[in-house]
Structure formats: C-alpha cells, structure tokens
Amino acid sequence: MATANSIIVLDDDDEDEAAAQPGPSHPPPNPASPQAEAPGSSQPHGAGGSSSSGGKKCYKLENEKLFEEFLELCKMQTADHPEVVPFLYNRQQRAHSLFLASAEFCNILSRVLSRAQSRPAKLYVYINELCTVLKAHSAKKKLNLAPAATSSEPSGNNPPTDPSSDPTNAETTASEAPRTRGSRRQIQRLEQLLALYVAEIRRLQEKELDLSELDDPDSTYLQEARLKRKLIRLFGRLCELKDCSSLTGRVIEQRIPYRGTRYPEVNRRIERLINKPGPDTFPDYGDVLRAVEKAAARHSLGLPRQQLQLMAQDAFRDVGIRLQERRHLDLIYNFGCHLTDDYRPGIDPALSDPALARRLRENRSLAMSRLDEVISKYAMMQDKSEEGERQKRRARLPQATSSHSTDPLKASLDSGEGPSGMASQECPTTSKPETDDEEDEESEEEEEEEEEEEEEEATDSEEEEDLEQMQEGQGDDEEEEEEEEEAGQDGDKSPMSPPRISTEKNLEPSKGISRSMGEQQNKEFTVSPSSEEPLAPSSIDAESNGENLEELLLEEESPISQLFELEIEALPLDTTPSPEERDISSSRKQSEEPLTTVLENGAAMVTSTSFNGGVSPHTWGDSCPPCKKSRKEKETGAEPLGNSYVERQRSVHEKNGRKIPTLPSPPSPLTSMAPVADSSTRVDSPSHGLVTSSLCSASQARLSQTPHSQPSRPGTYKMSVATQCDPEEIIVLSDSD
C-alpha cells in the first residue's frame, strides 16, 4: 500500500515539475510510472491524463528515432548478412506497443546504440541483447496488457509507420484474448466431461453382467471399455491444454534398461526399440534382428551373420520376458475398480472355502490351456503365411540369374526369419526414418565410442610392444641355451663314436643285428616269472653289485617289466614315485640324444614320445631299454647326459662280448630347446625333458606267447605314451605286479 500511495503522490506532485526536466536523454530510475516523466513540451497541460498520453507519445517518437539509428548502424556493419535488419524490424513489430512507448525501451535503445557505436566489433552481441528484450515483451507473452494498450493508443498524430504496426498488434491481441478465454472454457468443459465419464464408468462397473449379454455388442463390459478409451483421449487432450505431462506413474510407462549383450551399441539400439514412444507394441524377432544388424553395420562391429542371429535370438527372449513381466505387473496394479479398493489379502474368501479355492485353481488351469491353444493356433497361421511369402519370393526370382541366386536366396531365408519370422527384407523402410533427437544421440554416442576406441588402441599397442620385447628376450635365452648344449655335446664326443649315417643306407647290417637280437630275446622269454620278481630289490643293492647288476638287468629284463617301467614313467605329475621308480625314470630321462637301432621284427626304428604325447624323431641305440643307474653314476653329473649314456651302453656291450654298431641320429629341435637339468632333479621337474617309450609293443605280447614263431614283416611301430598309459590301468598293473 505504501508503494501505491507513493506512486499516486508522485503523479500529483510532479505534474508542474515535468516541464523543468531536460528530456529523454536523462530518464528517471522508475520505469513503472513513465507517465510521471514527461519531457519538456511547449503545450500546456490541463490534466494528468493528457500529460501521461503526451509523455508516452513523445517516448514512442524518441524510441522510433533511436531504433532507426540502430538499424542504419546495423546496415553498415552487417553488409555480409542482410537478413539481420529485417529480423530486427520484425521483432520490433511483434513487440507490445506499450513497451515500445516506455522509458525502459528508450533506455535500452540508447545504451545499445552508444555501445555499438563505441565497440563495433561487438555489434552482434548488442543485437542479440535487443532481440532478447523484444522477444520477452512480445504481444503474445503479455496478453493481460492488451486492453490497456488499445485504450491508451491515440487515434491521431501518429507517424507513417503506426498504421502498419498498430492495427496488426490490435488484431493479434484481439485474437489471442479470445483464444485464452476459449482454452479456459475448453479446459473446464473437458474436466466436466471427464467427471461425467468417471461417474458413468463407476455405474457400469457396479452393474452385474449376465451370461446372455456376452454376445451382445452393446453389453455393459463393452460400453465400459469404450468409455475408458474416450477417457484416455480426453486426459491426453487436457494435458496438452494445461501444458503438463501425461505420465501417470504406471509400470507400463517405466523405461526398461537393456544390457543383455556385450556390445553397448547393440544394447542402446535394442533399448530404443523396446522403449519407443507410442502404443505398447511388442517387438517381433525380425524387429530385434534388424536393430542388431543396423547397430553392427553402423558401428562396423564385423560380426558374422550366425553370431548376429544368435545375439538377436537371445535378445528377443530376454526382451520378451521383461515386457511380459511389465505387462503382468501393470495388470495386477490396475486390475479391479472402486469396488475392490477395500480389498485386503487376508480377507480372501478362498482361504476359508476349500471348494471355492479348488474351483479357482481349475479355472486358472483351464484359462492357461486355452491361452496356449490360441497362441499356438495363430503362431501356426503366421508360419504358414510366412512360408507362402517365401515361396512367392522364390518364384519371382528370374531364371536367368539362377546361377547367381544362391547367395541372395540364402540371405532372404536367413534375414530375420526366426521364431516369429518377420523377414528383414519385407519392411526395410519401417525403421529407416529416425527422429532428430535419435540422430543427435547417435552422433554423441559415436563421438564417445571413437574416443574409447582410440584409448583402447593405445593400450593394445603398448601391450603388443611389451609382448614382443618379452618374446625377443625369451628367444635370445633359448638361442644361448642351444649354443651351450651344442658346444657341450661337441666337446664330449669320444673318438670311438662311429660316423653319422642314415638308417636307410644300413638296412643290410640291421638285418643281421635283428637276427642276433631275436636270439637274445628268445633267451629272455624263457626266463621264469620268479626271476622277474627280484627285479625291484636288485635296484636297492646297486651300490654293492656295481656293473654286474647292469649285466643281470640286461639279460633278465622281460617285455612285461619294460611295459611296467613305461607305465611308471607316464604317471601324472602329482604322484610321488618310489625310489625304484625314480631310478628307472631318471635313467631314462637322461637320454637327451638317444641312438637309433633296429627291432627284432625288422622295423627300421621305434620313435619316442614327448611329454604331451607327440612323437619325436629320437630312436634308441639298442633293442633293450636303458638300464638302471647306480647311485655313484647319479652323483657324478658333470658330463653331458647323452654321452654318458652312450659310453655306459658301450661298456655293457663290450663286457657281453658283442659289438653292435650304433647309428646316431641328428639332434632334435625339441631336445635342443629343452634345458639341461641334473639327474637328481629330473624326476622333480619332468616337464623339462622328454618321456621316452620302451621297445615293447603289441607284437611283443604275441612273441612272448609264441617265442619260436617267425618274425613278422618289417614295419614301424609308433606308440604314444599319452594314449596307452591310463592312470587306472597303472594302478591295476602295479597291484598285480
């Protein structure tokens, strides 16, 4: 009230002081009362109303002059953009006439003009400021000021621009005011109509539905459904008029986030598909497949066709389950009417009435079975229609391009025809048009993905460089180890070793050797099993027996004991072998470079197997397996393993009085790459060496039964330790022996 009284007092007191004010160049600080600051004029004023109208008229003339000066300045400074001046003029025409005749607009114009003249480089900044002010005071925004503006407009003494501006402003204000009043009336009418529909729906819900009305097209249930659809349309229209959101918080309106695949681009595309605005449409398998294909093509994922189909099938199942859950929850929350508002779970009559509960269960099972029948019926109909469409497409294919039509036909068959089977080629234009918002989102997503890809490429390149350096270091270490082994082997070669010759050139001497070895094995096969049993204790007395033990073992060792030793060698790594087995395995694993020999059946060679079951080109130097070593030989590990083994075998053969020429083989790359370990540690680290196989095979089992049978024809037997040594069989053999 104090502010209003002060304004009235200022209007009464300042009428006589208005003539003493200098002019519009020094306006008062209060723009709310522009009629109090009338510029100097020669006309006498008789009343306050005439002085206020004269002041507004003078402000309007001054504002028009200032605006024309600003437009002239803009024409000179914005010659490259001629659309600036018409834009400013249109903004000024749309502004309210009361604001155009105000001191506030005069202040803004004078300030903008002076700054634009002093700083021409910032002209567009001041143009933007003026446009913002004119837009804020446009006639559409200030509808309540329209009657005052029209009444305060003088009819005469207007510049030539007023007839073109004032009638348009009056027309716009006259058209806008009825529109606002009409929208208010429309809002009230829609609200009344909504209340009427709600009351009618409640009445129909309270009415009982007879079985005879089920087939009636105008039953109460159908009337209620029609009224509900109208109610939803009215509610949407009412939200548009009130400029508010139409969301009600239902479960079906909630957005479903999707993270089902490992590709975020595909996840975003599927999430947009299932959360598309509009009616709640359930996506088809073809829709999901098209979304996956578009995401893969747009972002160049490089996925094969089969993987895209599997991904689309998984996504379709996941999306379908989640949409069904959302619909089910929405039905639960919105099921019923005002009659069921007072329902509580504890007052269910089926809890106290077993007959009612049984009847409800029967009805539920019947409803589910009928629902499955309906779904299967229409699924079969859809499959038939799709099969017919595919046959039509095949018939349309031209006969001339039959040789080249295999790939397009396969593409048409595999282009999204899955469980529900909509082909991706049938409606290619349905998902092509996208909104501007989606394009903006995709552009932003592409930028983010490019940045992430650059970071990942940088990290991958660093990791690759580190791996290359590590591999180079390992390669250098292996080369050094190979050189050391070769140097050691060359230095320890004895002059008694025969020259290296291939087994193919020495087939004739090998036949004679095979005969002598066959006679020796025939002698060995006649040994009784009692002589085989003390084999294990003999290894314990190795210190006292010395070299005589080696001769005994060479003569008494049978193929069965050889097989047993082979199976002991192939035990798993986690087993702890006995001291006897350690002697056997250590003596065998010391042969890093074994020698080739000929079998009793005339075979050229028997290959050994590596630790993982692979066949290596190493061959034995004698038909008998390596003998057990004494502890003295174990302790002296200075000389290379291969040469010590060769010299030991030679000493045994010389004592027996036999001279068997050995055929050395070239060193294998596997043995050169394997590091040389001490004989005492070879059992603890079996992965560094080779697991060698003995000479016994399936043919030796037959020879043991018929010792004097004729030797079979020459052949090469390659046995794999990984295939013939089963842990279960090892346990059985060890128990039986």
UniProtKB/Swiss-Prot annotation:
Residues 579-592, 647-657 have a biased composition (Basic and acidic residues). It is found in: Cytoplasm; Nucleus, Nucleoplasm; Nucleus, PML body; Nucleus, Nucleolus. Sumoylated with SUMO1 on multiple lysine residues. Polyubiquitinated; which is promoted by CUL3 and SPOP and results in proteasomal degradation. Ubiquitinated by MDM2; inducing its degradation. Deubiquitinated by USP7; leading to stabilize it. It holds the Pfam family Daxx. There is a cross-link at residue 142 (Glycyl lysine isopeptide (Lys-Gly) (interchain with G-Cter in SUMO2)). There is a cross-link at residues 628-629 (Glycyl lysine isopeptide (Lys-Gly) (interchain with G-Cter in SUMO1)). GO terms for molecular function: histone binding; nuclear androgen receptor binding; p53 binding; protein homodimerization activity; protein kinase activator activity; protein kinase binding; RNA polymerase II-specific DNA-binding transcription factor binding; transcription coactivator activity. Residues 179-216, 432-474 form a coiled coil. Residues 1-55, 145-184, 382-556, 569-719 are annotated as: Disordered. Residues 624-737 are annotated as: Interaction with SPOP. Residues 435-489 have a biased composition (Acidic residues). One of its GO terms (cellular component) is cytosol. Residues 730-737 are annotated as: Sumo interaction motif (SIM). The modification Phosphothreonine is found at residue 459. Belongs to the DAXX family. Homomultimer. Interacts (via C-terminus) with TNFRSF6 (via death domain). Interacts with PAX5, SLC2A4/GLUT4, MAP3K5, TGFBR2, phosphorylated dimeric HSPB1/HSP27, CENPC, ETS1, sumoylated PML, UBE2I, MCRS1 and TP53. Interacts (via N-terminus) with HIPK2 and HIPK3. Interacts with HIPK1, which induces translocation from PML/POD/ND10 nuclear bodies to chromatin and enhances association with HDAC1. Interacts (non-phosphorylated) with PAX3, PAX7, DEK, HDAC1, HDAC2, HDAC3, acetylated histone H4 and histones H2A, H2B, H3, H3.3 and H4. Transcription corepressor known to repress transcriptional potential of several sumoylated transcription factors. Down-regulates basal and activated transcription. Its transcription repressor activity is modulated by recruiting it to subnuclear compartments like the nucleolus or PML/POD/ND10 nuclear bodies through interactions with MCSR1 and PML, respectively. Seems to regulate transcription in PML/POD/ND10 nuclear bodies together with PML and may influence TNFRSF6-dependent apoptosis thereby. Inhibits transcriptional activation of PAX3 and ETS1 through direct protein-protein interactions. This is Death domain-associated protein 6.
